[in-house]
Amino acid sequence: MVSARTPRQGAPALPDSLKLTIEYLPIATLGAGGRKLRLHKKQDIAALAKAIELFGFVVPLLIDQDNKIISGNGRLEAARQLGITDVPCIRLTHLDATKLRVFRIAENQLGQLAGWDNEALGLELQDLSKIDLSFSLDVTGFSAARIDSFILEGDGGGENADVLPDRPTSPVSRLGDLWHLGDHRLCCADATAPESFDVLLKGEQVRTVFTDPPYNVAVDGHITGSGQHGEFVMASGEMTDDEFTAFSIKAMARAADHLVPGGLLYWCMDWRHTLNTLSAASATAMEMVNLCVWDKTAGGMGSFYRSRHELVFVFRKPGGTHLNRVELGKHGRNRSNVWAYEGVNGFGAKKAKAREMHPTVKPMALVRDALLDSSARGDIVLDLFSGSGTTIIAAEQSYRQARATELDPRYVDVGVIRWQDYTGREAILAATGQTFREVREQRRMEVASPPPVSAPQLTVVSTTDVLPAPRVRVRARPLAA
């Protein structure tokens, strides 16, 4: 083990020949020093220029006695692009020509020997992400996608993110309620109605939509066993095929209304309704990008070819290119169109509770990774059918801003409570500024103590004056022989 040395008393001072002085020199007086050892791409110079604009030219160029650059060619080119005329320089006069050549290599290589502590870096970036910065963290030189990866590594990937609260029998939320969940919003509203999004979005545009609409399949006996779960309030097997297609068109049109050109729509669906989904996409002019398959790793109900997958259709709104945060693994994220995430099929108390709370609940990591693929930190993401609030939790963890609608007040409550449990913060009712707890107490009081109702004035009359005498109809029955 190497221990730190303390300076000896009477240790010699640094020789004057090794003391460094910063001088400012015109760019025009500086020249290249030997072979160019590092290759700078255009985006590298752009990143350096962005850093200089924000932090200033705080790292001087290193030059020899003839104004030849030893280190800092990239910074010099960035300064030229910014129109800077004079730059800070340190002249290395104590090294001979041979040592300068060796130093040029060492100075560029030694800094790369140490690796990053990814967990510590992730925590630092996570802390910075919580601050309302006036600039992007990609000024650090890391891409936005890499920053997302570091942050997720720093926080452990979302412990307890899939924990679901109990579904209430008497919901607090009511149709029309808009809840503010920190940076997110959840509205108890119909996802097919245009006016729902006037309240929810207030003119905002959406980068990505991830939604898991009802499949128009009866829950009882198909998705879960008999009696485990109530039916959805809409599209739970009661619609004809044409009606379900019309329903899908309306919902998909709302997504298309608010997506930015090039924004992606992730539309979860089962294999039975592939044609309905494609018909809705055609009717709303959405372009198909890919078809992803969620591999649940275990089969569900059924006796013939038990299903262990669900489909996630990926559509794009025309008029722009979609945001690609994968780029064939360039940023450390390797993705294909087969997504293997453990589902709630199989055994175990935790999975049984998840099935009981919501029959088609998606793993938070599945939704989060889709948001990481197609959006940036701070972007607005939309879920038309919020259900248990998984998209809201995924947005919370990935530093996106979720906007969600859910028609069933019970599931609105689940989404609110789940977010509160996960973050430790309180949801606020937009209309009154009250917390969820305060609204719950107030509405319980209203139910427990309804306003008095005046008794109606009754007039007693003789039934013989009003009602005719009953007519008795006698049917003759044949006598037994």
Segment roles from a protein language model:
Residues 16-412, 481:
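Core catalytic lobe of class I
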Residues 5-8, 440, 471-477:
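Basic polycationic patches enriched in arginine
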Residues 458-481:
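Long, low-complexity, intrinsically disordered segments
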Residues 1-24:
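N-terminal leader/domain-start detector
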Residues 177-198, 416-451:
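S-adenosyl-L-methionine
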Residues 7, 141, 424, 433, ...:
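N-terminal compositionally biased, intrinsically disordered segments and leader/signal-like regions
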